[in-house]
Amino acid sequence: SSFGIYYKLPTYTSLGFKNTSGIFINKTNKYTKSEHIVTGFDYSVGAASKISIEGFIKKYSQYPISVLDGISLANKGADFEVLGNEEIITNGKGETYGLEFLFQQKLFNKFYGIFSYTYFHSKFSGLTGEYLPSVWDSRNLISFVGGYKLSRNWEISSRWRFLGETPFVPYNLEESLQSYPNMILDYSQLGSEKLENFNQLDIRVDKKWNREAFSFSFYFEILNILAQKVPVPKEYGLARDSQGVIINPISLFEVDIDRNTIIPSFGFSFDF
């Protein structure tokens, strides 16, 4: 078991933010405080394998809150955006707790691998004090990395990742229609909608040639070999006719995005 208290400096994007008068209004923000409690046990299965189970609790205080949106910064950031570049206050709270199972096998009988499963909750408070799910509150997280060593320096390996349904902030379509192309997020609906499960399997094959003076390695890899869709929030555009002309009165429609691409790649290295 272990216990620790940690402090984190506010992000530079928040400390460097200026209001319209050119004043650094976030420079007095407090350090984010987090208290961690971890307990568990592990058990060796033979000479090469180990099983471990851990429970954890993390308590956060003095967490930054967006003054404009009234929510914790932990409830933002699911998209590609700069966090903290706004006025914030540091009186938010949060908590994360869960249980993790881990199985690990070192190279034995030509096989090696690590499998882990984590079940957890994560929530943070905003200006109202109400706890809302963080953007990474997927509840279920599974990962596997393993491989099998064949003869003559061939190796096949795989990586599997599964992520449960993740909360996201939907758009306010009425306000977004008036401000398009700037889409307006509706933070009052945070937690009401979730993305689909994320599930991806990657496969890789390696071959290595060893000589006295040098070694040569080659690999071929396929990402998302099962062609699973990557879950993303809905995207919208202006409705158009068959000629591409915007239809009046203007309205928004959901844009279909290709999200299940299989990505092959290869590479090599030469060492001497």
Segments and roles (model prediction):
Residues 33-37, 93-97, 134-142, 197-201, ...:
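Residues that define the transmembrane beta-barrel architecture of outer-membrane proteins
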Residues 3, 124, 141-210:
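C-terminal beta-barrel architecture of Gram-negative outer-membrane proteins
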Residues 57-59, 80-170:
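Gram-negative outer-membrane beta-barrel transporters
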Residues 2-37, 57-82, 159-182, 230-233:
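Surface-exposed extracellular loop regions of Gram-negative outer-membrane beta-barrel proteins
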